[in-house]
From Swiss-Prot:
InterPro entries: Ptrans_KptA/Tpt1, RNA_2'-PTrans_C, RNA_2'-PTrans_KptA, RNA_2'-PTrans_N
GO process annotations (BP): tRNA processing; tRNA splicing, via endonucleolytic cleavage and ligation
Protein name: Probable RNA 2'-phosphotransferase
Organism: Streptomyces coelicolor (strain ATCC BAA-471 / A3(2) / M145)
GO MF: NAD+ poly-ADP-ribosyltransferase activity; tRNA 2'-phosphotransferase activity
HAMAP family reported in the protein's UniProt record: KptA
Gene name in the database record: kptA
EC number annotated for this UniProt entry: 2.7.1.-
Keyword terms: NAD, Transferase
Gene3D superfamilies (UniProt xref): 3.20.170.30, RNA 2'-phosphotransferase, Tpt1/KptA family, N-terminal domain (1.10.10.970)
Pfam family, one: PTS_2-RNA
Function noted in UniProt: Removes the 2'-phosphate from RNA via an intermediate in which the phosphate is ADP-ribosylated by NAD followed by a presumed transesterification to release the RNA and generate ADP-ribose 1''-2''-cyclic phosphate (APPR>P). May function as an ADP-ribosylase.
Similarity comment: Belongs to the KptA/TPT1 family.
Length: 182
């Protein structure tokens, strides 16, 4: 499968499994799962045909493991803006997690901390490298270390998705380490 096609199918899956399943006539269950055959048929009916083999390739090769397959069903691993309950167990985070962003967001983050915005949870990375890649999608990355151990000790709840993304409702700015001003 061509890389360009892989990216297009992946973006299509993300859009319709995380944000707009109704646009192609899908109704995920409470856990965000849809039948793969229904997804493939709906995509074809709405002008974006792909095969089960292409879908399997996208799932297997996605470096961020954005999708989970269970039997005949598929869902996005996290990042939904639609109402879903991923039923992720509560997890004890490592001492530090990381958030990738860009400089233009730092003032708001200092004032409000990290908020989920249009998603259900704040997404945190387990390492600086991953957070750097996340931040780089929007420009020159800035990585903010998160004192996850102290947050957890203070009662904040963490979950970890199947693809290793750490999730929490909010990260108050007192738990963040900001870069020194230039």
């Amino acid at each position: 499968m061509q890389q360009e096609r892989t990216v297009k199918v992946s973006k299509y899956l993300s859009k319709h499994l995380r944000h707009q399943p109704e646009r192609i006539g899908l109704t995920p269950d409470e856990g965000g799962w849809v039948e793969i055959d229904a997804l493939v048929a709906a995509a074809a009916a709405h002008g974006f045909p792909f095969t089960r083999q292409e879908l399997d390739h996208v799932v297997a090769t996605n470096d961020k493991r954005r999708f989970a397959v269970e039997g005949t069903r598929i869902r996005a691993s996290q990042g939904h803006s639609i109402a879903v309950d991923l039923r992720l167990p509560v997890a004890t985070p490592p001492p530090y997690l990381y958030h990738g962003t860009v400089a233009r967001h730092l003032e708001a983050i200092r004032a409000e901390g990290l908020r989920p915005m249009n998603r259900h949870d704040v997404h945190l990375s387990p390492d600086r490298e991953t957070a750097t890649r996340v931040g780089a999608r929007r420009g020159r990355p800035v990585v903010l270390p998160v004192d996850a151990a102290t947050m957890h000790r203070d009662g904040h709840v963490f979950h970890v998705s199947a693809n290793g993304v750490w999730l929490t409702q909010h990260v108050p700015s007192r738990y963040l380490r900001f870069p020194a001003p230039h």
